[in-house]
Amino acid sequence: MNAIAARITGMQHIGLPTAEVQKTIDFYQGLGFTIATRHDINGRDFAFMKLGNLLIEVIPNDKPTMRAGAVDHICLNVTKIEELYKKIKDAGYKMIDQNIVDIAFWEKGARYFFIEGPNKERIEFCEIVK
């Protein structure tokens, strides 16, 4: 391990710019995230949303790009994907995938689907087959 890697302990958070902070918070709370912390910095409302060890920073931005960028998607590790797919679809989230997709990743494969968030971000729900 090199000297730089020795100081890196893992991913800390994913920054998500939005023109609608509360709408973004509500969206992620609907997926089970909680507000880890919220701050007013110079009149701008910042929030960190937490689910397990995943942290998303909701960044106020009057003119976010609202398109795919350098970060392609956020992936959430899940269990019981069929049950989760039905719950998310029934809750009215914007589905990108109309079915669960099987892919030959990992030793026995993986199953996933994507939804679209309020800022055009793509959220993947993925179960590694065991």
Regions found by a protein language model. Name each.
Residues 45-47, 72, 109-113:
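Short beta-strand micro-motifs in enzyme catalytic cores
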Residues 1-5, 89-130:
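Vicinal oxygen chelate
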Residues 20-21, 78-82:
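Helix N-cap motif at beta-to-alpha junctions
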Residues 1-22, 71-74, 126-130:
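N-terminal beta-strand motif that seeds the catalytic metal site of vicinal oxygen chelate
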Residues 48-50, 77, 114-116:
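Short, well-ordered beta-strand micro-motif
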Residues 16-55, 106:
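Core segments of cupin and vicinal oxygen chelate
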Residues 29-30, 87-91:
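Short amphipathic alpha-helices in soluble, non-transmembrane regions
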